Amino acid sequence: MGQQLSWEEAEAAGEMDVAELQEWYKKFVVECPSGTLFMHEFKRFFKVTGNEEASQYVESMFRAFDKNGDNTIDFLEYVAALNLVLRGSLEHKLKWTFKIYDKDRNGCIDRLELLDIVEAIYKLKKACRAELDLEHQGQLLTPEEVVDRIFLLVDENGDGQLSLTEFIEGARRDKWVMKMLQMDINPGCWITQQRRRSAMF
């Protein structure tokens, strides 16, 4: 009890090692000598200029990464966010995803907030058509149908809003809900492509 993990155990658990952290820092300093990353730079790194759907998704990601709400991402916020997205536990990813959906930061997700993100994710996934085809052989639901079904399965008190507890428990309880939410938790094809194209990553 209370023992610290060795580097090998930390790596096995999916945590970053010092060499990886140093590499990320070097890239961050080269791209952001001021020590902060602004929205327009964040979009540039993800190659979303001129792509409205991707831009909307990346703006939501930026707001979730910007923990202190100062409209910039510093190195610690950047590392924490990327480590979470790429390696975090399911519960941590769900909490982070909830923040992306909760645009007005009122602690609940309404239908419009959920629909906005689901629509953006659907459009992003079209860039990874092979992934969509593999995931959704057969009938593909519309974003509106996805939102209706999620609310039917997850909104336990029927108030038209999803609390963090409803969001997490609903995802854990229902495999379909989890799969739909994982479209945001881990947009694997898209985020991997963007990381490879970007000098930042």
UniProtKB/Swiss-Prot annotation:
SUPFAM superfamilies: EF-hand. This is Guanylyl cyclase-activating protein 2. InterPro entries: EF-hand-dom_pair, EF_Hand_1_Ca_BS, EF_hand_dom, Recoverin. Residues 14-31, 34-52, 53-88, 89-124, 142-177 form the EF-hand domain. Disruption phenotype: Guca1a and Guca1b double knockout mice show an increase in response to light in dark-adapted cone photoreceptors. Dark-adapted cone photoreceptors show a delayed response time and a delayed recovery time in response to light. Guca1a, Guca1b and Rcvrn triple knockout mice show rod photoreceptors have a reduced current decay during light response. Binds three calcium ions. One of its GO terms (molecular function) is calcium ion binding. GO terms for biological process: phototransduction; visual perception. Ca(2+) 1 binds at D66, N68, D70, T72, E77. Stimulates two retinal guanylyl cyclase (GCs) GUCY2E and GUCY2F when free calcium ions concentration is low, and inhibits GUCY2E and GUCY2F when free calcium ions concentration is elevated. This Ca(2+)-sensitive regulation of GCs is a key event in recovery of the dark state of rod photoreceptors following light exposure. May be involved in cone photoreceptor response and recovery of response in bright light. It is a lipid-anchor. The keyword Repeat applies. The N-terminus is blocked. It comes from Mus musculus (Mouse). It is found in: Cell membrane; Photoreceptor inner segment; Cell projection, Cilium, Photoreceptor outer segment. Ca(2+) 3 binds at D155, N157, D159, Q161, E166. The gene is Guca1b. Keywords: Calcium, Cell membrane, Cell projection, Lipoprotein, Membrane, Metal-binding, Myristate, Repeat, Sensory transduction, Vision. A lipid is attached at G2 (N-myristoyl glycine). Expressed in rod photoreceptors in the retina (at protein level). Expressed in cone photoreceptor cells. The keyword Repeat applies. Ca(2+) 2 binds at D102, D104, N106, C108, E113. One of its GO terms (cellular component) is photoreceptor inner segment.
